[in-house]
UniProtKB/Swiss-Prot annotation:
Molecular function GO labels: ATP binding; dTMP kinase activity
Source organism of the structure: African swine fever virus (strain Badajoz 1971 Vero-adapted) (Ba71V)
Domain of life, per lineage: Viruses
A family per Pfam: Thymidylate_kin
GO biological process: dTDP biosynthetic process; dTTP biosynthetic process; dUDP biosynthetic process
Pathway field: Pyrimidine metabolism; dTTP biosynthesis
E.C. code: 2.7.4.9
Gene that this sequence comes from: TMK
Binding residue positions for ATP: 10-17
Similarity comment: Belongs to the thymidylate kinase family.
InterPro entries: P-loop_NTPase, Thymidylate_kin-like_dom
Protein name: Thymidylate kinase
Catalysed reaction equations from the record: dTMP + ATP = dTDP + ADP
Keywords assigned: ATP-binding, Kinase, Nucleotide biosynthesis, Nucleotide-binding, Transferase
Length: 240
């Protein structure tokens, strides 16, 4: 038995952070253990540096920035593994699919070692932000042209995500409707996931969550080759 890893994805400005925090609060009110991780995380040295680059306070090459993002994602893998062991619902705002979509917009291939594949992904679909910022306030990657390229990359990536692990939601829907859809589906995924001990990694290896020892913690020792491990299965993956 383990927790689940949920990601909320989409271009900047479509309400991901709002929905992630609402989901966490709603789950906690229903007595689920839930945690929300947002990338980039300003509480880490790597995350703080990334935010400086995104806010145009520090210059860095595109290749260096995407490598830094990859490192930043990997920094949280041990924490995510421990939370899954403790049966938490881990909600991630911007994760592997964002890393791929944004890197591809700059023609860069990123390293995906030690990154988990989400149990379920909610993609808030929109080609442009719900409230566009003035040009002077736009972060790196927030120009109209760049966001359209990133959206196109997202749609290609989402086509490769198994449909039983994906919900594509128009970001322009009423926020309450989006929240209800995400909450209902997350609970179902958690309930259906209760018998699983493994989580798949991006390189198609598996982390044996059941064998993790939180007192002598070396999560990478529990990574195993693909060997017909059981996986979450749900025929209700849907697109609206």
């Amino acid at each position: 038995m383990r927790g689940i890893l949920i990601t909320i994805e989409g271009i900047n400005g479509v309400g991901k952070s709002t929905q992630a925090m609402r989901l966490k609060k709603a789950l906690e009110c229903m007595d689920y253990n839930a945690v929300c991780i947002r990338f980039p995380n300003p509480d880490t040295t790597t995350g703080g540096l990334i935010l400086q680059v995104l806010n145009k306070m520090t210059e860095m090459s595109s290749e260096q920035l995407h490598k830094l993002f990859t490192k930043h994602h990997s920094e949280f893998s041990a924490e995510i593994a421990a939370l899954l062991k403790l049966n938490f619902i881990v909600i991630v705002d911007h994760y592997i699919w964002s890393g791929l979509a944004y890197a591809q917009a700059d023609g860069i291939t990123i390293e995906t070692k030690n990154i988990f594949k989400p149990d379920y992904t909610f993609f808030l679909s929109s080609k442009k932000p719900l409230n566009e910022k003035p040009l002077t306030l736009q972060r790196l990657f927030e120009t109209k042209e760049k966001q359209e390229t990133i959206f196109t990359n997202f749609t290609i990536i989402m086509n490769d995500v198994p449909k039983n692990r994906l919900c594509i939601i128009p970001a322009t829907l009423n926020k309450e409707i989006i929240h209800t859809m995400i909450l209902t589906k997350t609970i179902k995924v958690f309930d259906n996931n209760s018998c699983l001990n493994y989580i798949k990694m991006y390189d198609d290896k598996y982390l044996n969550v059941q064998d993790l020892n939180l007192f002598d913690f070396d999560w990478q020792k529990c990574i195993e080759d693909n060997n017909d491990k059981e996986e979450y299965d749900d025929d209700d993956g849907f697109i609206i």
